[in-house]
Amino acid sequence: MRKISKILLGLVLVFLVLGLLGCQNNETNNEPYIITFVDYYGNVIKEVNCDGESICEIQEPTKPANVGQRYFTRWSIWPSEWENINEDTIIKPIYTLDNRVITIGGRSIYFYSFFIMIGIFVALGIGVRETGRIGLKKDDLIDGFLWIVPIAILGARLWYVVFEWNQFVYGGFFPSLLRILGFSSGTLDFSSFGLSGLAIHGAFFVALICAYFYTKKRKIDIFKVFDIVAVGFIIAQAFGRWGNFFNQEAHGGIVGGAIGDTMNLSLEQQFNFLRYTLHLPEFIVNNMYITRGLHSVAVEPFTGYYHPTFFYESMINLMGFGIMLLLRRYKKIHFGELLSFYLIWYGGLRIFIESMRTDPLVFEIFGITMKSATVTSILMILAGIGLSVFIRLRRKGMDYSTAKNPWF
């Protein structure tokens, strides 16, 4: 037994030594290698031949040109990592995303409008599934949807215009009216048409007002409809914010902040914070690289990586949506309290988001500049609390215990 033990111990030692030698050999590579820089299409921009004996000195090539609406952000390997390369390597350019879904005949469909429509139809589908469960008719919901949604979009537009008045109203009545309606040129030039400014608060409040009159006309329980609207809005917003992502708008400040005209973090550090500290998907981080003054110097004072507040808002709205689905299954929740929850949830969320955004809609009162969304959100929270108290006191027995088998 002792001999066998000694033999086994000897074999273990041999394998350990061989393993260590193997590891040492793998760390050293004296073979020549080539580092190749390519452009967006894979064409070679520059080749660097390295002898493998010493650290290869690499001079960064000229930055590749933009491709359509995509612009260059960085190389696939950061310059600080080039000295660690010891084998044939292809370094590719990383670009921002195109904000167009498709272009046909010179006219483009943008992700902004695409995600808004996706959100609207998802909200409609969820609402239709809910109507039968709480004693409403599908046709009533669909009829209301067909005329309330366009008016709500108009409300979102007008809300935005009111706080950006000088951007739209100048040069006479009709040019101003056309700009408000979406013709940015101020003429009936359909190539310039597009609703590039919408505010969700305007859409929400106009939708509630329209729903009030619609339910009065159809003699429907308004609080049941309000709950459907609230659930629909929060999921529609979760989708809609991705349109802001592709437009590189409604973002937060530069990652790491800045002192005066100097960013606190390098571009690589900004990228690493979003990618490896917050663990955001790389395609999101790449598209948060925004050039100085893309919308205005006040909004983007630096070229660098900005906080994706759209993503934070979208994810937190999805959480709120999930909670609302659970609340609908709780029999003691009264009809209308989902609207209360939405007002409080989104009001609090929007105050948090507005504290980071660089492009808020503002107004002045008594010489004090205020953020429109922050003031509105505070009022939403107060309204949500007041509505919940009113429902509990005045609508006893009108709760989800009367609903049929819950969905989700």
Segments from the language model and where they lie:
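Short, solvent-exposed loop/edge segments of extracellular or virion-exposed proteins
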Residues: 35-52
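Sec-dependent N-terminal signal peptides
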Residues: 7-15
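N-terminal secretory signal peptides that target proteins for export/translocation
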Residues: 1-3
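Extracellular/surface recognition and adhesion modules
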Residues: 37, 72-75, 93
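Sequence contexts marking disulfide-bonded cysteines in secreted/extracellular proteins
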Residues: 24, 49-51, 55-57
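Surface-exposed interfaces of beta-sheet-rich extracellular modules
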Residues: 31, 54-86
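A feature for loop-to-transmembrane-helix boundaries and adjacent hydrophobic helices
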Residues: 5-8, 20-29, 96-408
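Append "Rare intracellular matches occur via the same short Y/T/C beta-strand/loop motifs
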Residues: 89-95
